[in-house]
Amino acid sequence: MEKFKNLPFIKQIRQSVGLQRFMLLTGLIIILIFVLAAIFAPLLAPFSYSQSKADGISFATQATPDAKHLLGTTVGGLDVLSRVIWGSRTALYTILVSVVASLFLGTFLGLISGYFGGWLDRILVAIADAIYSFPSLLLAIVMAIMLNTTGGSIFGGIMSAGISITVVFVPQYLRVVRSEVMK
């Protein structure tokens, strides 16, 4: 247990007080619930992602919430709660892909840029500045649309969203690593 006391987020929790501690713990609990819902989606969701009937009876379309469908159903007769729970899994995959890819690519490019310098450094920084000049959400949406050519495959959707978010966040890692290398 002594090993964990020096972890940055444990120190932050121990040092925070009042409203700051409440907000920090609330955020951690929400993230924990989200991650657990994504991991245990097959156990938590009452129906599968695309299930539109149970016991041979089709679900009603656009049904209001009731005991069987806690959040109602969609136009296509799909359970909304099940789709929300399964969607958290897709979101978690996308987050993992984009964070890992951004971290590795940004660190690699930052090391190259800071170490070699010169014309390569100027080009990489100019590209990073160009990416910064666009609104990040708009850039990510446009890139995801351009990259998603699979027509509905969950893997293709996760990868296109992950790559588009990666492109938006790479310049941040690049700048931080580059500045540390150049010191």
What are these regions (language model features)?
Residues 70, 74, 105-106, 114-115, ...:
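Generic hydrophobic transmembrane alpha-helix motif, especially the helices
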Residues 1-107, 111, 133, 141:
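Gly/Trp-centered helix-boundary motif
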Residues 45-52, 149, 179, 183:
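Perimembrane helix-loop junctions in membrane proteins
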